[in-house]
């Protein structure tokens, strides 16, 4: 992709904007960055980029900078943003940071991609551990720390041969030619529907992960996902399933307590290879075992040895606030899954424990929690609700779990989490799990899910003395 002399507009100064601008400048482009928020953080970022030669405009952009012939947008920017509408009207190509990284990547660099509603970060981290255990120069990138553009263009001793790429529906929406060697859709549930305009375009965005020639790896337990892979992927590329069931030929799955590969073997009809045991997967919740199988399928697609899959799983350390055990107090386990910000993630978390005091609530973003409550009702010892939309959860609980005691915490100040944890401790009995799996976003009370999880863990430790 030739960029020298081109006039490129970059939208946004968030996580992806600055590294995209730096990469474009390095390739000789004339760069203008537009950012709607004029605050201290963005003024400092703007100062740094101006020193490198970029033009930066702070304040809500309404027009496309004159002469622009390419737009690289930050993934969260909606297609109806005025500057992007102006680009479309002018016939100017709009791509995302991932698409730019793909076009500029060095020859021979392999991409293995993961998308889905929940579990993406865990899966790419597991994959990274497997690849490194096999001696590969590999890095997990995307929403997990290192921006894709930085990793793809790193050179010298920092160059990466394989990228385990976490891709959101936003990033995929703005991608046109990305063709990973293999890609997995690990699950799909309603999320970001306001941005995409409904479930069908959301699913179609996810399916763009299957480029021409991409090995299609899909959760075989979900017929809708298999259909998505069949209808949107390359029909000439292999289709590999994974599930928690005994695998059929061409799948990865479970045989008793063994993770088994019947896809990447010489004769899938008659052969199977043991990859690991359930004891190698941490935590051993069902949805996390599915993540491990997806990661294993991606690793095996490029010939990673079975022993490296096992070693990688053993070396893997879960990310904070994802089914993280905080403490055991008086026989009660306290678990932080603050990252469970939607109903699908909360349902998976709740399914991992037989008897739960559930801490839930926050911003539901218009999601329907009726099915979640109905599904979880038999596991609930009690519920503690907090946050702006807790009344919606209360209504669902009153209808589908009327026998379950509910404590409603109305306060939203710094002491709210202490009251929440204390109430949960009163409801819990020996052998129970107090589980923070809010099924909601956190911004009504906290900066993000991390701050919410840290507040929970802090109050649990205080309870332990």
From Swiss-Prot:
It is an enzyme of class 6 (ligase). GO terms for molecular function: ATP binding; UDP-N-acetylmuramoylalanine-D-glutamate ligase activity. GO terms for biological process: cell division; cell wall organization; peptidoglycan biosynthetic process; regulation of cell shape. It catalyses: UDP-N-acetyl-alpha-D-muramoyl-L-alanine + D-glutamate + ATP = UDP-N-acetyl-alpha-D-muramoyl-L-alanyl-D-glutamate + ADP + phosphate + H(+). Pathway: Cell wall biogenesis; peptidoglycan biosynthesis. ATP binds at residues 116-122. One of its GO terms (cellular component) is cytoplasm. It comes from the Bacteria. Coiled coil: none annotated. Its EC number is 6.3.2.9. It is found in: Cytoplasm. Keywords: ATP-binding, Cell cycle, Cell division, Cell shape, Cell wall biogenesis/degradation, Cytoplasm, Ligase, Nucleotide-binding, Peptidoglycan synthesis. Signal peptide: none annotated. Pfam families: Mur_ligase_C (PF02875), Mur_ligase_M (PF08245), MurD-like_N (PF21799). Its main location: cytoplasm. Belongs to the MurCDEF family. Cell wall formation. Catalyzes the addition of glutamate to the nucleotide precursor UDP-N-acetylmuramoyl-L-alanine (UMA). This is UDP-N-acetylmuramoylalanine--D-glutamate ligase. It comes from Thermobifida fusca (strain YX).
């Amino acid at each position: 992709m030739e960029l020298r002399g081109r006039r490129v507009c970059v939208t946004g100064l968030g996580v992806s904007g600055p590294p995209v601008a730096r990469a474009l400048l390095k390739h000789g482009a004339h760069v203008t960055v537009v950012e709607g928020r004029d605050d201290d953080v963005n003024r400092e970022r703007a100062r740094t980029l101006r020193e490198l030669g970029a033009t930066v405009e702070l304040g809500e952009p309404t027009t496309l900078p004159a002469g622009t012939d390419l737009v690289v947008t930050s993934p969260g920017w909606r297609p109806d943003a005025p500057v992007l509408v102006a680009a479309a009207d002018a016939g100017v190509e709009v791509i995302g940071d991932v698409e730019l990284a793909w076009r500029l990547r060095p020859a021979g660099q392999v991409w293995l991609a993961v998308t889905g509603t929940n579990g993406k970060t865990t899966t790419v981290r597991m994959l990274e551990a497997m690849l490194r255990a096999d001696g590969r120069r590999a890095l997990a990138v995307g929403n997990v720390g290192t921006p894709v553009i930085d990793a793809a263009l790193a050179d010298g001793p920092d160059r990466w041969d394989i990228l385990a790429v976490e891709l959101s529906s936003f990033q995929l929406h703005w991608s046109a030619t990305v063709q990973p060697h293999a890609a997995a859709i690990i699950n799909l549930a309603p999320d970001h529907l306001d941005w995409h305009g409904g479930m069908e375009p959301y699913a179609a965005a996810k399916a763009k992960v299957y480029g021409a020639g991409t090995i299609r790896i899909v959760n075989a337990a979900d017929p809708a996902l298999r259909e998505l892979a069949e209808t949107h992927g390359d029909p000439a590329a292999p289709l590999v399933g994974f599930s928690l069931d005994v695998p059929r030929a061409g799948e990865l799955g479970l045989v008793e307590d063994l993770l088994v590969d019947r896809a990447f073997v010489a004769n899938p009809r008659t052969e199977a290879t043991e990859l690991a045991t359930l004891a190698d997967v941490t935590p051993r919740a069902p949805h996390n075992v599915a993540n491990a199988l997806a990661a294993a399928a991606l690793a095996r697609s490029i010939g990673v040895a079975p022993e490296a899959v096992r070693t990688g799983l053993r070396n893997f350390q879960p990310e904070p606030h994802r089914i993280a055990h905080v403490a055991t107090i008086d026989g009660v386990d306290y678990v932080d899954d603050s990252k469970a910000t939607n109903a699908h993630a909360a349902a998976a978390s709740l399914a991992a424990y037989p008897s739960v005091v559930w801490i839930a609530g926050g911003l539901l973003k218009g999601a329907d929690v009726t099915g979640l409550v109905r599904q979880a009702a038999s596991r609930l010892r009690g519920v503690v609700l907090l946050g702006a939309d807790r009344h919606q959860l209360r209504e669902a609980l009153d209808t589908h779990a009327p026998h379950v005691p509910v404590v409603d915490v109305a306060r939203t100040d710094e002491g709210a989490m202490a009251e929440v944890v204390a109430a949960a401790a009163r409801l819990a009995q020996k052998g129970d799990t107090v589980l923070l799996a809010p099924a909601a976003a956190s911004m009504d009370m906290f900066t993000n899910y991390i701050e919410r999880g840290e507040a929970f863990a802090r109050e649990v430790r205080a309870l332990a003395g």
